[in-house]
């Protein structure tokens, strides 16, 4: 018969045994490129080798910084070896000759000299007049009668002859011994002071400090409340009868009290004690004995600077001003002082007018020197000569000026102020004073020494300000 229809598919048989690996097939057609999804972040790699140094960066902007706050005091350094003996300075110019003194009083007469040698015999003089008749002799025996004689005429004696000529003068006698010395004549007037000696060799220039960053200007503070009315002052001295002659000097109290003028002088005005200023890294000092050191207004930056472009700038640079200070204690945290808190730290001063010039006399010992004859004392103090601060800049004080004789001694007699409105004491501020000297050790090598607080006044020279008395 015919073949039957195809039957249904049977069940799958059991898997066969693994066949032998067939030959490698021909390469297939390239597949379609489909971007896959981003894989997960891999683990961090190991540290790579250091790269080559990059090129130098551009220069920074030239911004001047402000001075940092005062740091803590360092440990005292070891004592250095003694310095070598310095060269002897050149002698000063000779002073002008003094005015000749008045002639002394006449001395007592000297002793008589020895008698001179016997003179030569003089010429014979004319015969002198006859002498008086002699006494009668004894009566002789009678003579023999003579012959009659002639009449004899007896004439009268003639007049005396002229005196004989004077004999030749005798030889000069030996000089007598010198008479006793005469009384000393009165002292001549005081000679003029000699010319100033040549200036000393300048000291080494200090290293320039780093400029700090300029701080942002803070907002102006609000005005404080007005202070209470002060008590009335003491009654001043009576006015002098004489007319003032225009001799002006300044007196500094080194406290917050306004000083009074000495007796016999009159006040012109009062103010605040300016010592020196520093601008563009250059310092200029004021003579404390003149009225320029007594400003009637106080500010931490009393000056401004202008350029050739007709532009002026105020309180916008790293400039300084320095003022005589008071004994007020600085804050424990050494923070800069600003605003109304500055008032207790600034010394007051008074400008006075006197009838004559005022000078300072320095003893260079711990004894107060006397005023010259004909001068009166105005005040006594300590011999102040020089001061330096930021950038080793500073100024000196004329020793003839009343400003070189401060009535109070302090190792830090001035305070530093800045244009940003703050003031403080800093470790690079130094004061220089005349030392007390032993007259027996002149022209000898000074003995190095270090004197601590409590004994400082024992090595500082004393001084006195004197004024010429009115005639």
Swiss-Prot record:
Matches recorded under InterPro entries: Collagen, Collagen_IV_NC, Collagen_IV_NC_sf, Collagen_superfamily, CTDL_fold
Cross-link (S-Lysyl-methionine sulfilimine (Met-Lys) (interchain with K-452)): 334
Keyword vocabulary terms for this entry: Basement membrane, Cell adhesion, Collagen, Disulfide bond, Extracellular matrix, Hydroxylation, Repeat, Secreted
Sequence position, cross-link S-Lysyl-methionine sulfilimine (Lys-Met) (interchain with M-334): 452
Protein name: Collagen alpha-3(IV) chain
Broad class of where this protein is predominantly found: secreted
Source organism: Bos taurus (Bovine)
Subunit structure and binding partners: There are six type IV collagen isoforms, alpha 1(IV)-alpha 6(IV), each of which can form a triple helix structure with 2 other chains to generate type IV collagen network. The alpha 3(IV) chain forms a triple helical protomer with alpha 4(IV) and alpha 5(IV); this triple helical structure dimerizes through NC1-NC1 domain interactions such that the alpha 3(IV), alpha 4(IV) and alpha 5(IV) chains of one protomer connect with the alpha 5(IV), alpha 4(IV) and alpha 3(IV) chains of the opposite promoter, respectively. Interacts with ITGB3.
Modification(s) after translation: Prolines at the third position of the tripeptide repeating unit (G-X-Y) are hydroxylated in some or all of the chains.
């Amino acid at each position: 018969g015919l073949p039957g229809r195809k039957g249904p598919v049977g069940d799958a048989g059991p898997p066969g045994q693994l066949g032998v690996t067939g030959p490698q097939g021909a390469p297939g057609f390239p597949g379609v490129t489909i971007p896959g999804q981003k894989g997960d972040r891999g683990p961090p790699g190991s540290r790579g080798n250091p790269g080559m140094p990059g090129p130098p960066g551009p220069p920074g902007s030239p911004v001047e910084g402000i001075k940092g706050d005062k740091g803590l005091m360092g440990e005292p350094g070891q004592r250095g070896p003694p310095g070598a003996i310095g060269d002897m300075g050149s002698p000063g110019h000779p002073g002008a000759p003094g005015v000749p003194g008045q002639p002394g009083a006449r001395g007592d007469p000297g002793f008589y000299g020895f008698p001179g040698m016997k003179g030569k015999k003089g010429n014979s003089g004319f015969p002198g007049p006859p002498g008086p008749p002699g006494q009668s002799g004894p009566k002789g025996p009678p003579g023999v009668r003579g012959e009659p004689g002639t009449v004899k005429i007896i004439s009268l004696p003639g007049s005396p002859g002229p005196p004989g000529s004077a004999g030749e003068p005798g030889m000069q006698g030996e000089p007598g011994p010198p008479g006793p010395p005469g009384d000393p004549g009165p002292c001549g007037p005081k000679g003029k002071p000699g010319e100033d000696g040549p200036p000393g060799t300048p000291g080494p220039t200090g290293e320039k400090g780093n400029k700090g960053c300029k701080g942002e200007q803070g907002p102006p503070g609000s005005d404080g409340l007005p202070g209470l009315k002060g008590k009335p002052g003491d009654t001043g001295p009576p006015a002098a009868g004489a007319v003032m002659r225009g001799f002006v000097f300044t007196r500094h109290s080194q406290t917050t009290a306004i000083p009074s003028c000495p007796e016999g002088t009159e006040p012109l005005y009062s103010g605040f004690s300016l010592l020196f200023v520093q601008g563009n890294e250059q310092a200029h000092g004021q003579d404390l004995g003149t009225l320029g050191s007594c400003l009637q207004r106080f500010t931490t930056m009393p000056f401004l600077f202008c350029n050739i472009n007709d532009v002026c700038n105020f309180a916008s640079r790293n400039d300084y001003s320095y003022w005589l200070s008071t004994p007020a204690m600085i804050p424990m945290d050494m923070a800069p002082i600003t605003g109304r808190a500055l008032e207790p730290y600034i010394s007051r001063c008074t400008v006075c007018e006197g009838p004559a010039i005022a000078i300072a006399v320095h003893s260079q010992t711990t004894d107060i020197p006397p005023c010259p004859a004909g001068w009166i004392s105005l005040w006594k103090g300590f011999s102040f000569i020089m001061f330096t601060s930021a950038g080793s800049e500073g100024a000196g004080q004329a020793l003839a000026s009343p400003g070189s004789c401060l009535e109070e001694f302090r190792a830090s007699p001035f305070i530093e102020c800045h244009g940003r409105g703050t003031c403080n004491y800093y470790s690079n501020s130094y004061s220089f004073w005349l030392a007390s000297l032993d007259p027996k050790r002149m022209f000898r090598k000074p003995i190095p020494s270090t004197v601590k607080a409590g004994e400082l006044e024992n090595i500082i020279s004393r001084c006195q300000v004197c004024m010429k008395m009115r005639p």
